[in-house]
């Protein structure tokens, strides 16, 4: 089977790896000069298998109103003329109930835990390195109220058998002694010992090199113009003015996936959630994080690589704008100076932004479509790095008609369709859509 993958970020590259291992002839195309150079380039570096949570959560609507007036708000909305922005926001608000939050988080945890297993197996098989650490993650709470709210997450962690520890202030410093130099005294924290860290871009590029050795063809500098449709089937894509035919096409274009699908009448509710990062040369290891922490108040993570510190997070709903907002840099600098002062060189920091492809419910869109030969692997939001290996392996099983190792419930685009459209992929299990 000849498979054409559109996009060579971490999602497209892991898809290529697993499809190649399944015996497919794989071609990957991307507009950049190499793999992992857009949203995968400088994300937070957290592999948050246990921390997986949707942005749509109880209390977020009221918080969003308050955040409108805060300089360092974790979520901001910049109105555009794009009607899709408002439709997406309205759908997200519908998922902020406790009931929907529990359903969505359970789906995300299912995929994230599977992805942890897949990444561990891939690493053992290939020996791939990406400045990774297996030292867990810590979610820091600045207020007792934040600590009290985490109870609902703990219930789901217990349900899925995910190890966790609720830390007292003294226990926090045991795992992250560098926090003692900071100006904040946290009343408590949640530690997830099975979570990891690593450089997503480094992983993507090294996995692409390994996949190329297996025969996967990577073509860079390629613009995907449109999909080729023959009746009920997608038969390829027009790339740089030429038709590239394939038995199966995988759309892994992140936030740009809906733009390619719209001419086919497929309204995919994926919208850019703009994130920011600041990468600093490390200047004092004793004052740096041992692993990674997430400041819950600002949704900013501080992560340690070998000789670098990555400060990343926040979300800005502002369409496809990729300009660098100096106010967001100020927030990143404020947080790292609060928690790990003196750990990195702010004067030599690399400021970056990326468009994270978010769904209203937080769960990605992986699987079949109403068109034969067309599959999706997109919509991972802030958790593309976390979910990448599991998503790629799961998709390869679907495409190759093999039994999936996890339930497909709620993972494909059919959950968004109001009317019941039967899945045309004969082998891929589809879940009946829900309104």
Curated annotation (Swiss-Prot):
The keyword Ribonucleoprotein appears for this protein: no
UniProt keywords, alphabetically: FAD, Flavoprotein, Oxidoreductase
Class in the EC hierarchy, top level: oxidoreductase
GO cellular component: cytoplasm; plasma membrane
Pathway(s) of this molecule: Amino-acid degradation; D-alanine degradation; NH(3) and pyruvate from D-alanine: step 1/1
Superkingdom classification of source: Bacteria
Binding site for FAD: 3-17
GO molecular function, one term: D-amino-acid dehydrogenase activity
Keyword Oxidoreductase set for record: yes
GO terms of biological process kind: D-alanine catabolic process
CC cofactor: FAD
Catalytic activity: a D-alpha-amino acid + A + H2O = a 2-oxocarboxylate + AH2 + NH4(+)
Function in brief: Oxidative deamination of D-amino acids.
Annotated NCBIfam families: PRK00711.1
Family: Belongs to the DadA oxidoreductase family.
Protein name, UniProt field: D-amino acid dehydrogenase
């Amino acid at each position: 089977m000849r498979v054409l993958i559109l996009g060579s970020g971490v999602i497209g590259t892991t898809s290529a790896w697993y499809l190649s291992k399944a015996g497919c002839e794989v071609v990957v195309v991307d507009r950049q000069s190499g793999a992992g150079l857009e949203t995968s380039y400088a994300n937070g570096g957290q592999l948050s298998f246990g921390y997986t949570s949707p942005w749509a959560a109880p209390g977020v609507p009221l918080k969003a109103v308050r955040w409108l007036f805060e300089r360092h708000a974790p979520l901001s909305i910049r109105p555009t003329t794009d009607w899709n922005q408002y439709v997406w926001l309205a759908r997200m608000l519908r998922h902020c109930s406790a009931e929907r939050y529990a359903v969505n988080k359970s789906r995300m945890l299912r995929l994230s835990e599977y992805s942890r297993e897949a990444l561990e197996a891939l690493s053992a098989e290939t020996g791939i390195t990406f400045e990774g650490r297996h030292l867990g993650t810590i979610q820091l709470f600045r207020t007792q109220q934040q600590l009290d709210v985490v109870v609902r997450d703990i219930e789901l962690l217990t349900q899925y058998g995910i190890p966790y520890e609720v830390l007292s202030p003294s226990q926090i410093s045991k795992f992250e002694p560098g926090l003692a130099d900071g100006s904040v005294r946290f009343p408590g924290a949640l530690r997830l010992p099975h979570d990891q860290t690593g450089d997503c871009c480094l992983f993507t590029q090294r996995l692409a090199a390994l996949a190329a050795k297996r025969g996967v063809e990577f073509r860079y500098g390629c613009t995907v113009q449109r999909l080729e449709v023959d009746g009920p089937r997608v038969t390829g894509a027009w790339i740089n003015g030429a038709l590239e035919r394939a038995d199966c096409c995988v759309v892994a274009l992140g936030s740009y996936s809906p733009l390619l699908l719209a001419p086919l009448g497929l309204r995919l509710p994926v919208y850019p959630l703009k994130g920011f990062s600041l990468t600093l040369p490390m200047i004092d290891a004793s004052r740096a994080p041992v692993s990674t922490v997430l400041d819950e108040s600002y949704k900013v993570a501080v992560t340690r690589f070998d000789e670098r510190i990555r400060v990343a997070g926040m979300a800005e709903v502002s369409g496809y704008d990729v300009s660098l907002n100096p106010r967001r840099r100020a927030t990143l600098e404020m947080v790292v100076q609060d928690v790990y002062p003196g750990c990195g060189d702010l004067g030599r920091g690399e400021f970056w932004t990326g468009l994270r492809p978010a769904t209203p419910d937080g769960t990605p869109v992986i699987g079949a479509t109403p068109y034969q030969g067309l599959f999706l692997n997109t919509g991972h939001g802030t958790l593309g790095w976390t979910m990448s290996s599991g998503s790629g392996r799961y998709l390869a099983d679907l495409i190759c008609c093999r039994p999936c190792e996890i339930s497909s419930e709620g993972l494909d685009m059919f959950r968004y369709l109001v009317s019941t459209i039967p899945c045309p992929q004969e082998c891929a299990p589809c879940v009946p859509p829900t309104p």
